[in-house]
Amino acid sequence: RARAIESGEVHIDVAFMAAPTADPRGNATGRMGKSACGALGYAKVDSHYADTTVIITDNLVDYVHNYAIPQTDVDYVVPVESIGDPEGIASGAIGFTKNPIQIKIAELAGEFLDQAGIIKEGFVFQLGAGGAPLTVAKFIAEKLRKRGEAGGFAIGGATGILTGMLEEGLIKAIYDTQTFDTTAAASLDKNPAHIEMSASMYANPWTDCTTNYLDVVFLGATEID
């Protein structure tokens, strides 16, 4: 979608963007405020290319530091009482699985990656937010911890599980487009190695996007043929 928007294949007449914090000029961020949700990676592209961009916020401040959306991309700022509940970004899928079959699958996947030599110093990976992929991350962390190694960067959607690995030194950075829980949202504001990026930087195939550097991706699915 980011590629289609940037190429002109998809045209946006007006973009209404909820932002947890903004200033009167339109600089906006998801890092802070009572509704802090983390990265605004998808909103970055829409707000830049839309004919008209409207920022809707429940935390209007004098100045925004580390903005995701700059005032040069914004036409209107609309203060409201509430843009939503940030607790809603943390769904029941975001956590280690307790299903014994999924745990075994995750364990086997982690062991396969280790035996194949993929889990090593500096390797780059992406996690889905489902229970099985996050459980794979647990096994990866154990392997890295045991060997005293660290991965390179991880690509988010970021979760508290990923940010925990970052804080422990098991990975060196997180590139984040969409933050999946409130723990990760807090990390984005406080940790300089937790880096916000646009959806285009994440996966636009016409650019040198971060997915070009992935060694492995772990995704969960409800059904696979």
Model-derived regions, located:
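Conserved alpha/beta enzyme-core scaffold
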Residues: 1-225
